[in-house]
């Protein structure tokens, strides 16, 4: 998650929140990731919510510390379990680009979200190819991601320019991420010369290199059911 993206998410969630509501953060990752690897996630999003008596439950397919509900959002039984809890807000941040089949996850969000509830969705807009464990290079515009939730009303949409955070340093673009690693630069340049080996990965690498000096950004939308 980008630094400014976390600020945007936190600010929008506070605007629509009131004490007593329940939020579900899907694809949440661990407490270690939210509090230490990218500490601004906790600082700008979850700490203010906690201070305002907002309940946030974190769900992920991986059982780690900080994951409240472990389960697979493509599993109908698991979805039915979540639907019974009546979540007024669902957060889905930087998950959809890692799904080969996004349909079941999007359908799950629509099913689980309470009537008149809000879904806050973010995905990268300009960010290089990164495996976690895969990256489909899904980099939609505001309209493209809203079309996935066309039954919902778009309350706000923005392309948020921001900085990434890796190895305790901020980076504004891909060049700043790789310029201290000559071996990686050489590897990327050589990869660009071999289009016939794993052509899809080659294409994604070309896109990443093409945008090497462009600022990182994320597509962020808030929709209402």
Segments predicted by a language model, with ranges:
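Conserved SAM-binding loop
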Residues: 21-131, 143-146, 221-223
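Helical cap/lid subdomain of alpha/beta-hydrolase-fold lipid enzymes
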Residues: 1-4, 26, 201-205
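Short, flexible hinge/linker loops that cap or flank conserved catalytic cores
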Residues: 17, 50, 213-214
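Extended interaction regions within the primary functional domain
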Residues: 8-12, 26, 212-214
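Short, surface-exposed alpha-helical recognition segments that flank or form part
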Residues: 1, 97, 211
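S-adenosyl-L-methionine-dependent methyltransferase catalytic module, highlighting the catalytic core
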Residues: 100-111, 118-224
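Hydrophobic, Leu/Ile/Phe/Ala-enriched alpha-helical segments that form helix-helix packing faces
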Residues: 12-14, 49, 149
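Class I SAM-dependent methyltransferase Rossmann-like catalytic core
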Residues: 1-20
